[in-house]
């Protein structure tokens, strides 16, 4: 029984246990199947943000899984994923379970715990995530969030379209305005050469191209309107290579000037045909597109990439182009998605682009694992840091301090004026003490105290510098810090937190200082290192500092203690080639004036020391060619050394064969063996061959379209002795494609307008040739009437620094507007000076001679009569008792010296003594200003005497006038001299038939000084004198109108005499200078010259010879017989020391009418009425003189 029961019990137990076991198996299988069936792991995700997980997450993922998530973003966006949770089976090389992320250019493989918290960015707009698990050992898997992050075109270059189906154009929302000038800048790289290439086009509303930049059979051309403007001499097709290079094009309709900025240098040319076109609005701007030719677009577009295309509606200057940065926005079109319609397939993200955001590479050791299990097998992910101001880079590979600036506004209701920085600092540190992030306070400062309505309450603003010790590579956003502070306990001590804001401290922006040292954008307290210039084997350093006053970042000064400069280079025969290569590399960069001088000096040292073979000579020529690209201002100080170095170079070159030519972009030198026994003359020419950019030399004949031709006559060696002829072995030839090295500081008002060629026979000086050397040189710019002058570079001029000299050279009769032929009786550097200012057209040689004759005759007469006026008033004491006479004496003195200095100026200028010329110019300037000033003082005296209502006594009246009349001009001239003595010097005026200045003159050279101290100064005095002239004439005419004892004719004559008298006394005739412009300029120049050169004569006539009191003094002391005036005449009894106010009537008499026959009795009565200088009179005619 027991056995039976026991058996049934075991059977029941087994059946129930088996059922439960089977049920559990079924449930387990059902759950597994449900997990697998409910999780989709092969999907395409296109939402702007979201997340996905491994199957069954957070439970263990199933075995043998294979999943693929494709995250697709629109063009202009990248994909960013973050591993919120990650746990896979660990294994070396992730050979079992793994996640593979394809970012676009590289793959990253993860397993174990390594990816937890990691953020990755795609390089394009697609990212793929693959997950694979094997048959055993499952973990909980992963949870990944993703989002689309907008990126600018700064990170992307665009592939030039290879088919007409691909259109890269400006968006429809962008309207192209009417363009009469433009600047286009972009970066470009070529992958393959084509016969014709189009880079960009602009078409009008009808689809017709009105602007295109392209390569044609004629080279690089800019198509404007309907004209082709060649820029092949500025930029060749070979300059566009596989390396991305910036390029800017400018155009101005008014001048037809086309500029090209490439490789850090600016070149320009004139395209006159483009001046008639205006680019109409409403056009379509395309990258590539249909150019000006009829070639199929598929065959015409350039093969390569374009980047950072920007357009402005004005033409930038070279200085503006050189200062362009990535942040300079095109005001018509900019490199931004909002301006362009570009297919995503045409864009490529490239971290090497010049304006791309910072790129950081995550190294394999970033995840950090000691055992090696679960470490990434391959991890070469490139992660782009999105350029924002409030996002910390999530891919930081080093534990560095991150700085925040916090602004706290606190209300103090306890102590109004206290500084609570210590209390707030303690509160901040306590707040962050037990936080999960390591944050501490590095500084705090009180910025502002505002008194509120209640006297005991103030609102205070504090700035705090917070430092986050980032030891876990975990982001800390500003909002988290703000939230922490707002939720913190109260500050206490009567302080209440009103508001708080937290901002990530700005980085120090990318900077170039000094030249050649480019510092990348840097985080605060980080020190950057860049290679030294020119020696790049050492580094300079610079630290991004924190301003402790306002907690902003700034760059400290660079530390270049480890760097050495160019002057430290040691030159010897052994290292000459190495030094030359170094200097060529240095000169290929933009050099400052100081650096350029150092390079040229070192080249001169090298040429003097080394043996010059063809290879070394070629390198030296390259250096000088690079120097010639620098600004003319930078070349000025180095030109003498550079030219002498080239001269020495061609003398020392060792060569085999009949000749040697060394070419570069801006300089070509040639040396040819000379057979003195069979020399019958020679022709040397410089030209640019087809499909080349560097000039060449032909020693045998005149090349077609030669830039310069030198023909040496058969009699060239005739003046050499036999011993000299035996030593002659070579003919040297040099062609300079740029003229910056030939800067004449005393250029006679002329401008160099040709290439420069130089030729020599050995190192001998050849001059006084029987037959001249014929030099034919092309002009740099076309001119209808060039008026050329042939000159050569004379090293003996200007203290041996060199200058232009025309001795022994003349212009050939077969010269034209494009080329000039020079005939010279010696050999040296030759060029053509040309009057490009067109000043010679205003006054021709004939008129210039006439004006010069009038000026010298007039100034001589004026000086004589100014002296006569002065002597008259000095000789007769009674004439100089009144104020007007004393003022007139000062004015006559000033005019006398002005005319005398002017007459001596041209003669003294011919002595070529700089100090003497400066002295003469200073005195001429001074006496011109004193003349203006005393004319102004004349009008001021009239104002005081005529306009003031009551009698006036001014203490030391004439002394004060003298201080102003002589002191103000002296102060002005003194200031000019103190600022720069070079403001004065010798200049040339007028032009002769040979283009030379016909008149040497010591005068003001600086136009700013001239216009400020002469033109502006005189303008002020002139306007004042005009106003006074009008007032005086109104008073005189009003008085004359009340007189009934004169006829109308007499009144008119008296008024006319007053007008003429005042006109010359107040210098009104100097105003003719304001009208010497345009077609009437010559007429007013004659009027100006005649009247102003004779001003002293007119003053003598009207204010001395025709004055009745002067005539009486002359008659009394200088005449005899009947003409002599008796001593007992009315005049001899009349006092003249009048110090009262002049009536309008008497003023008119004293200035004009009294000189033309006013009665003696009338004048005498007026004088007697005012004998007492301090008496008060009710009579309106009382006077103050």
From Swiss-Prot:
The chain crosses the membrane at residues 850-870, 887-907, 916-936, 958-978, 1014-1034, 1058-1080, 1084-1106. It comes from the Eukaryota. Residues 1138-1160 are annotated as: Disordered. Residues 790-840 are annotated as: GPS. Gene3D superfamilies: 2.60.120.200, 2.60.220.50, Rhodopsin 7-helix transmembrane proteins (1.20.1070.10), Spermadhesin, CUB domain (2.60.120.290). One of its GO terms (cellular component) is plasma membrane. This is Adhesion G-protein coupled receptor G6. The gene is adgrg6. The record marks 827-828 as: Cleavage. Changing residue 969 to L: In lau; allele tk256a; semicircular canal defects. Belongs to the G-protein coupled receptor 2 family. Adhesion G-protein coupled receptor (ADGR) subfamily. Disulfide bonds join 41-67, 94-111, 185-248, 229-271, 369-375, 508-544, 532-563, 790-822, 809-824. SUPFAM superfamilies: Concanavalin A-like lectins/glucanases, Family A G protein-coupled receptor-like, Spermadhesin, CUB domain. The keyword Nucleotide-binding does not apply. One of its GO terms (molecular function) is collagen binding. Ca(2+) binds at residues 89, 97, 134, 136-137.
